[in-house]
Amino acid sequence: KTEEPVCAKSTPSVESSASFRPARALGKNEQLSMEKFRIYLQMKDDKKAFQEIESLVQEYPMDMRYQVILGDVYLQNGKKQEAYDAYQKVLAVEPDNPMALFSMASYYEQTGQKELYQQQLDTLLLNKKVTSDTKISVMRQVIVENEQSSAKDSTQVIALFDRMMKQDIDDPQIPMLYSQYLLSKNMEQEAVPVLEQVVDLDPTNKAARLMLVSAAVKKEDYKQIIKVCEPGIEATPDALELYYYLAIAYHQAEQTDSVLSVCSRALEHVTADTRKEVISDFYSIMGDIYHTKKQMAEAYAAYDSALVYNPSNIGALNNYAYYLSVERRDLDKAEEMSYKTVKAEPNNSTYLDTYAWILFEKGNYAEARIYIDNAMKNDGEKSDVIVEHCGDIYFMTGDVEGALKYWKKALEMGSESKTLKQKIEKKKYIAE
């Protein structure tokens, strides 16, 4: 039989041991004795607690659980030799008894025998006959003890995990706990191969896969994002987050058709519970891609869908408005959409530029200048497009000198505008 510890304290966990699941159903007397034992423990009446357990040991001599609990009660009350004898008695009968192995580790730790403590933990954690659940419980206990100790030496915990990982592991719980521990210590790079082992063992583990995605996003490694997400959407086809990251990564890799297909696949898995903002984002990405492919009707249809699901989708509002203004069509609709973005993010140079440009296309030059100046104040001078727009707007407000200054600056920044050189030569605005 295998018993599984519920470890949550740094002392030899008598209460924990008491809550081990028995291998068989308890009789009424046993249930009563165990309940009394727990109550006596809570009341700190160790003498009566002793008596209850001793009576259970006598009544059920073949049930090793009670022998271990008796040892734990001895240890908690400073009767170290009696505790040792109780554990050894159990291990003589059941050498792989996880309760007794763990209690022996506690015994060695309490008696200051650090090397034996480590050896005992290895005996338990590297034992193929001990269940993964038990090992997980023990490692959680080890982590708690390590965090509570004055030394707080995470290298010991990591070394223990590493020894476990060298075995043939077929349960993803162990590498998952290890990766969570590494992440808690800000060791993200070290956690990556461990998380990869988790998803190899359990491709449906979405949490581990998203941690891998997060690590790749921080490194801006779109190839790694693709590598992690492609099998992810096969294993967990309902995980819309994976489609989203995959779409962004394909976009960076300039795989435009792949972006469209992954967004379409994501939309097939939308349910009544899916957040409307998420659906909107997929349509918005599709709008951006259709625009790069010069499929403007499809782009506008996608943006319309995005705004049906989330009328406040700022990215969709801005891009939709800007592309309309470039085509010089539906300018009132474009202005309305763009104004929402400026209201939502008044210091965003991209949104300020879009709004200024729409006002420019509508002939509202004085107002356009106010917004383009704001865009320039908010990092807009780093964009050759915004700088050129600034020159265009300045020209239309009668400031030819200012216009030339910004047009020349845009040219120096490497602008690919078709009319920019002509504007500088002729000293006047020329529409593209």
Where are these regions (language model features)?
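Alpha-solenoid helical repeat scaffolds
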Residues: 1-397, 405-432
